[in-house]
Amino acid sequence: MAEGAALRALRGCLAAFPREARELGSLESIPYLDRPPSPLEFYREWDRFVMPEERQMPFMDFLDIVEKKVTSPNIFYVQKQCSNLTEEFSELVCDVQPDIPWMSEALGKKPDAVNFWLGESAAVTSLHKDHYENLYCVISGEKYFLLHPPSDRPFIPYELYQPATYQVSEDGSFQIVDEKSADKVPWIPLDPLNPNLEQYPEYAQAKPLQCTVKAGEMLYLPSLWFHHVQQSHGCIAVNYWYDMEYDLKYSYYQLVDRLTKIVGVL
């Protein structure tokens, strides 16, 4: 009964969002994006960690692509991890809560960032973790999460990659350009939906959780939890990042992480 009441309370919190915020797909309620979008999606091309190309375009043009009014072979995703809702979509700030009051009260702080997400179904966020307490609110569509608790760290591989960026050439094709002066990036090489257990046999011991977050629902994603994210086409979401406390939980994770690295070297 208590869990059911809590779930109803969360849904009620999201249901209180104004209709304009829940129906951002209507052209009248969409502002223009006047800065380059910065997707979270990272691409792994063999031995490189390739950041996506960033493109400046009117937001209306982006919507035409998502709604298939314009054909494009590329994958488009609007996301920038620096509170882009408040920085780039100021017209919508009054339509979405600036924070989640009960979470702010529980943590004794306001969110560091409020992020806006909108993209195609082909845009996938690879497995990673964040140093934030994350409240993920789906306004339209669905998000599909695959989750690992921090205790699964010994079974999750990391490798070092040469950082690079996709750039568009004059003929419209993409080329990968290395960032030669940058240090190599540690990243998870494994696709949790289709893991190569011959190459990474330890992952077979991990216990992934999967959940679907539907419109009007909210997911609390604790800091340091690994997550891989997919979405339905045109899914609209807002998430709230609260900085984590670097307390005993963080120290425990650091211990597990370092022991995992030591064992991997031996």
Residue map of PLM features:
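N-terminal accessory scaffold of Fe(II)-dependent oxygenases
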Residues: A2-M218, F226-L266
